[in-house]
Amino acid sequence: MIEVGIVGGTGYTGMELLRLVARHPKLRLAEITSRAEAGTRVDELVPALEGAVDNVFTAPDTERLSRCDVVFFATPNGIAMESAPALLEAGCRVIDLGADFRLRDPAVWTEWYGMSHSCPELLEEAVYGLPEANRDALPGARLVANPGCYPTAVALGLLPLLEAGALADGPVVADCKSGVSGAGRAAKVATLFCEANEGFKAYGASGHRHLPEIEQTLARVAGAPVDVTFVPHLVPMTRGMQATLHVVVDRPLDELEALYRQRYADEPFVHLVASGGHPETRWVRGTNHCRIGLHQPPGRPDRAVILSVIDNLTKGAAGQAVQNLNRMFGLEETAGLEGLAYVP
């Protein structure tokens, strides 16, 4: 069994990690940390895990964590980079679900996250953990930067176009919507029920932290800069994410569909819906799947609208982290991630 540690187990992402690790056939939860809940049984805080997890939260301790084979960081930005060097030195692998190792340029990190990077020497080594685009770099990796939720939905929606050079010159617009769990579990006025329910709003329109990550990811695939207009929105649902992508293309819809079907034919978690279909977030709820729909506006053969839906907590965070772990340790990529959404 692979010994797993989770740093930050009380947020929504950490709780989703707990759920996935608990049911994984090859993982054993060795350490689960929380400064605020140290000494509390996990199943007292998360009753849904009673009978599956009998661990007790402990305060973060590098020496204890270093005995694990791999440690997940489900922590606020800036935490993982303080602990990762010591864990790596001890031979422990690290998967960071935060943003500490996603951006290659430390100056760009500082610009968007407002703090200096404490271990910029590790940025080049960190593997960007989007398996569908970077699968071969994951086996044996010591340090993996788990992608953000919005970058995941956008990248999966555009990968086939970029790889085939089918994206023509013109604007790329990423109009994205997320459930409220994407804002985290900490109490904030904007995410109180009476504030978020029966409302719909954009945020970060003048600059969101996921923008440089999106552009960096797309540029890596395209081999050239890709300028993106990215506007996220908050919708009154708990979990789920949709990226509606408006692009200029060089081929008709039937050729685009053939391109996407061929590209994702062997991907266990990415699926193109039936021609003319509109994927829904509830179709992927609680799963590691992404479902994609393709459309072309009438009379505009040079335009395409791509619909990409994921669960922000699973494929957008914890599920993708487990998928990365599976690749790192030579397991079946789908291990512990089987299952479809529950509907209705």
Curated annotation (Swiss-Prot):
Its EC number is 1.2.1.38. InterPro entries: AGPR_AS, AGPR_type-1, NAD(P)-bd_dom_sf, NAGSA_dehydrogenase, Semialdehyde_DH_NAD-bd. It comes from the Bacteria. Coiled coil: none annotated. The gene is argC. Keywords: Amino-acid biosynthesis, Arginine biosynthesis, Cytoplasm, NADP, Oxidoreductase. SMART domains: Semialdhyde_dh (SM00859). It comes from Halorhodospira halophila (strain DSM 244 / SL1). One of its GO terms (biological process) is L-arginine biosynthetic process. Catalyzes the NADPH-dependent reduction of N-acetyl-5-glutamyl phosphate to yield N-acetyl-L-glutamate 5-semialdehyde. It catalyses: N-acetyl-L-glutamate 5-semialdehyde + phosphate + NADP(+) = N-acetyl-L-glutamyl 5-phosphate + NADPH + H(+). This is N-acetyl-gamma-glutamyl-phosphate reductase. It is an enzyme of class 1 (oxidoreductase). GO terms for molecular function: N-acetyl-gamma-glutamyl-phosphate reductase activity; NAD binding; NADP+ binding. One of its GO terms (cellular component) is cytoplasm. Pathway: Amino-acid biosynthesis; L-arginine biosynthesis; N(2)-acetyl-L-ornithine from L-glutamate: step 3/4. The keyword Cytoplasm applies. Pfam families: Semialdhyde_dh, Semialdhyde_dhC_1. It is found in: Cytoplasm. Gene3D superfamilies: Dihydrodipicolinate Reductase, domain 2, NAD(P)-binding Rossmann-like Domain. Belongs to the NAGSA dehydrogenase family. Type 1 subfamily. The active site is at C149. Its main location: cytoplasm.
